[in-house]
Amino acid sequence: MPLSYQHFRKLLLLDEGDPLEDALPRLADEDLNRRVAEGLNLQHLPVSIPWTHKVGPFSGLYSVSTLTFNPQWKTPQFPLIHLKEDLIPFIESYFGPLTSNEKRRLKLVLPARFYPKATKYFPLEKGIKPHYPNDVVNHYYQVQHYLHTLWEAGVLYKRETTHSASFFGTPYTWEHKLQHGTQPVNVQPAGILSQSSAGPPVQGQCRLSRLGQKSKQGPLATSPRHGSGGLWSRTSATPWRPSGVEFTSSGFVCHSARHPSSSINQSRQRKETNTSYSSSERHSPTSHDLEHVLLPELSSESKGQRPLLSCWWLNFKHCQPCSDHCLHHIVKLLDDWGPCQHHGHHFIRIPRTPSRITGGVFLVDKNPHNATESRLVVDFSQFSRGNTSVSWPKFAVPNLQSLTNLLSTDLSWVSLDVFAAFYHLPLHPASMPHLLVGSSGLPRYVARVSSSTNSYRNNNNNGTLQDLHANCSRHLFVSLMLLYQTYGRKLHLYSHPLIMGFRKVPMGLGLSPFLLAQFTSAICSVVRRAFPHCMAFSYMDDVVLGAKSVQHLESLLASVTTFLLALGIHLNPEKTKRWGKALNFMGYVIGGYGSLPQQHIRDKIALCFQKLPCNRPIDWKVCQRIVGLLGFVAPFTQCGYAALMPIYTCIQKHQAFTFSLVYKTFLKDQYMHLYPVARQRAGHCQVFADATPTGWGLVMGNQRMRGTFLSPLPIHTAELLAACFARCWSGAKLIGTDNAVVLSRKYTHFPWLLGCAATWILRGTCFVYVPSKLNPADDPSRGCLGLLKPLPRLLFQPSTGRTSLYAVSPPVPFHRPGRVLFASPLQPGDAWRPP
């Protein structure tokens, strides 16, 4: 028989009805719950009607949304972020000694370390994920530009050789110990011949030096090594700057110097290049030994031929165009395309790093509200699954009640935005080989994505470039012509292969959120101790400050901003928001009245119910998305999570769920009328409840009550009923009980009707645990009133979450002057402390 909505509300005790001691135990009856489920069409029976796979914006939890490429994306500009290395002494000079907990958390990131037991290496062709098949070339260049921007900002290392890397920025102490110096091992890239190398040809100057012997002639013979080996001398009179010497990922290539009066013919240069390629294939250099290629003898048989350079891009300048869309026309636009590669200001030794990657990258919109800027997505998912998975450390996430207890105060609030928060935390160089990103170069990437013949790679391995025009096409020509207006001569630089490792903590790693949460929570703990009359709280990169007046808040903001900037933390002043008394934080609006969800979440729920169909089976994957949205707001409704249990059951069984009209109306009424989650108050417990399978007992001050059930009930159900009776008849918001299930406030495993009603009755009620021997309601629950036991003095303290996110800061030592850097409107004795 169908059930009307009014009768259903009355059944759940949401409206006035029968006496509580009679109506509430009936809700635990299994037969009644079954009949109500039949009346609401919630039996979860298999249906033959086709499932609905899309409800409004929800299309299933596992459906992959199509990414949209924006050719006009702007790459964000990153400053040279350098967190102070002597962080702990610097803070102690500001605010006095730190606690051991604060020191422990700060040491985790100075530097951070990541050493997985196993790492998979992938070919460079998989460095850039092909998520935009229609914009392959544009996406490639934007990713290359983004990676170079991060490298120049000191976020990435650039792999120079198997055992060396270069970077920009200020070196840390642990990098000084591994530093090569400021002179790069290779200055002359492939295909770019030195303009200052006038003089005789280099025949006889290069000797085969595989075992580390010094060359007998030329500038390469005067570079002494350090005693430890592997470090290039910075004090040498003739540093490693050979003319026309290229160091590639596979070896060294020597090119002859170009001079107007040079007698070296171009046929020899072609043979020289081929010999260099074959030699570099046979021998891979190490960090201790340089291998110099012996140049072949001169030949005069092939005069007039152009040299075949090892640079794919520059070879188009000397070749004949194959068509109107040949890349030769683009390369001829400039006479000087610049070097094939750049080097950082500093060089360091690194562990053996192969010419491969460990994670792919691609670009997306910066956020749903900003499609003009791009964001680099790094996929290091290999460390979260399979044989290379890593067990990430767990850290506390504040729940709704803890946030409300902590932040629901009559303070004025301001939120700070930390610019590129993850890129503030330095990584040890030994972690670089596990966090590699890059690309294989333009020709190999285009050939792979377009599924064309990979002739360039094959012929390049053989030392020839006969199929130079294999990738010439109208699409590539038009794309490069348009990109030339944006990048200019950088088209050449970005067309080369690139391998980079992270110098700062990447966002795509499971370890990063833990490190950032520990770091920001330690900083806020220091701020709270320095300004005990104020409030500072952080979760990840969200930092909020609170004070009792607007003037006080502005002074606090100025002092904290100066302190953070002194630490090397960059803030985004454009995103600093002043909220007044209502703080918007983590999706909630938190004020003196309590917490409520933000308006944009309410709008999503209203749209969800508007699009939700009735009497049609909905795919359980779509139900997962719907429940994910409704579950976030469930604590603000009358019946909480218990009202969603029919949908949860279908999801667990992988069955479609059908919304009846009454059930949809019930949920819509629940979510259109929200109640704030109030802040809990400390106090002494005066009301106690206890139950047995056959009876219940209450103690309310000097008053005692007892009763019996019509039939024996499970002990947890009986304890829950006793707590509901105590809340309704005493009106107390603090109740003592000895049942752990009632204390947990998780009522989703009780009979559905009872769980919904109990959630509404016990809303806003706090529980405190009392042992059974000390529970004064234990005797009344067994039917024995007897003498009244003295009430135990139980103090309830509201929870503010785990100590890793919020810890009570010790006061400033008395022998130090006050660290408040402004005239505080509060008296020193009126120090406000978080609840």
From Swiss-Prot:
Catalytic activity: DNA(n) + a 2'-deoxyribonucleoside 5'-triphosphate = DNA(n+1) + diphosphate; Endonucleolytic cleavage to 5'-phosphomonoester
Keyword Cell inner membrane: no
Key words of the record: DNA replication, DNA-binding, DNA-directed DNA polymerase, Endonuclease, Host-virus interaction, Hydrolase, Inhibition of host innate immune response by virus, Inhibition of host RLR pathway by virus, Magnesium, Metal-binding, Multifunctional enzyme, Nuclease, Nucleotidyltransferase, RNA-directed DNA polymerase, Transferase, Viral immunoevasion
InterPro entries named in the record: DNA/RNA_pol_sf, DNApol_viral_C, DNApol_viral_N, HBV_DPOL, Hepadnavirus_pol/RT, Rev_trsase/Diguanyl_cyclase, RT_dom
Location of region: Disordered: 211-235, 258-288
Residues engaged in binding Mg(2+): D417, D541, D542
Activity regulation remarks: Activated by host HSP70 and HSP40 in vitro to be able to bind the epsilon loop of the pgRNA. Because deletion of the RNase H region renders the protein partly chaperone-independent, the chaperones may be needed indirectly to relieve occlusion of the RNA-binding site by this domain. Inhibited by several reverse-transcriptase inhibitors: Lamivudine, Adefovir and Entecavir.
Residue numbers spanned by region Spacer: 177-334
Region annotated Terminal protein domain (TP), chain positions: 1-176
Domain Reverse transcriptase span(s) in chain numbering: 345-590
Residue(s) at site: Priming of reverse-transcription by covalently linking the first nucleotide of the (-)DNA: Y62
Disulfide pattern: none
Molecular function terms from GO: DNA binding; DNA-directed DNA polymerase activity; metal ion binding; RNA-directed DNA polymerase activity; RNA-DNA hybrid ribonuclease activity
EC nos: 2.7.7.7, 2.7.7.49, 3.1.26.4
Family to which the UniProt record says this protein belongs: Belongs to the hepadnaviridae P protein family.
Note: Hepadnaviral virions contain probably just one P protein molecule per particle.
The protein's role, per its UniProt record: Multifunctional enzyme that converts the viral RNA genome into dsDNA in viral cytoplasmic capsids. This enzyme displays a DNA polymerase activity that can copy either DNA or RNA templates, and a ribonuclease H (RNase H) activity that cleaves the RNA strand of RNA-DNA heteroduplexes in a partially processive 3'- to 5'-endonucleasic mode. Neo-synthesized pregenomic RNA (pgRNA) are encapsidated together with the P protein, and reverse-transcribed inside the nucleocapsid.
Domain notes: Terminal protein domain (TP) is hepadnavirus-specific. Spacer domain is highly variable and separates the TP and RT domains. Polymerase/reverse-transcriptase domain (RT) and ribonuclease H domain (RH) are similar to retrovirus reverse transcriptase/RNase H.
The protein's name: Protein P
Lineage: Viruses, Riboviria, Pararnavirae, Artverviricota, Revtraviricetes
